[in-house]
């Protein structure tokens, strides 16, 4: 018995109540082109996530589901990447992202005081876990794992700019 695929297209989860919508062809065309550089679609997963985050500023659950569908994977496969790699954001962040290293070298070099200083200046809770964003949406502060500058601790990043003491 021959089965016929449904003719109803799968809805694009980026077009949802969260306000996400792929620009007509622009982002999807970029992603389609990225995928062609890899022997298997799944191998493009990180690059697809980078493209989505660069466009939207973060990776929503809808984007996870859309990416999984696009790459022929299960959403959990994409979610694992989003939650494993510290460069990906699963929630909205401020225009300015301040990341302070909290690993041993930086902690001994004063990263906790640096983090506390930023939080106090921006009206955030210095003792809260995870990332925090100011009410105006301008700044996000978070403790992160090693930023690979142990010899010049403490280190931090503001957006993509690496800063050391």
Cite the ranges covered by each PLM segment.
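Signature of N-terminal electron-transfer/Fe-S-associated modules in redox systems
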Residues: 1-165
């Amino acid at each position: 018995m021959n089965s016929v695929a449904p003719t109803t297209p799968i809805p694009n989860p980026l077009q949802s109540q969260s306000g996400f919508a792929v620009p007509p062809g622009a982002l999807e065309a970029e992603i389609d082109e990225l995928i062609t550089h890899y022997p298997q679609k799944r191998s493009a997963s990180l690059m697809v996530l980078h493209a989505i985050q660069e466009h939207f500023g973060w990776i929503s659950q809808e984007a996870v589901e859309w990416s999984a569908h696009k790459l022929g994977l299960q959403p959990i496969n994409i979610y694992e990447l989003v939650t494993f790699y510290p460069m990906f954001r699963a929630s909205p962040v401020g225009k300015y992202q301040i990341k302070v290293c909290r690993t041993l070298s930086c902690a001994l070099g004063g990263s906790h005081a640096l983090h506390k200083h930023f939080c106090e200046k921006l009206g955030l809770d210095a003792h809260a876990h995870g990332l925090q964003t100011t009410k105006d949406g301008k700044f996000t502060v978070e403790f992160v794992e090693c930023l690979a500058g142990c010899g010049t601790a403490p280190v931090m990043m503001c957006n993509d700019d690496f800063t050391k003491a």
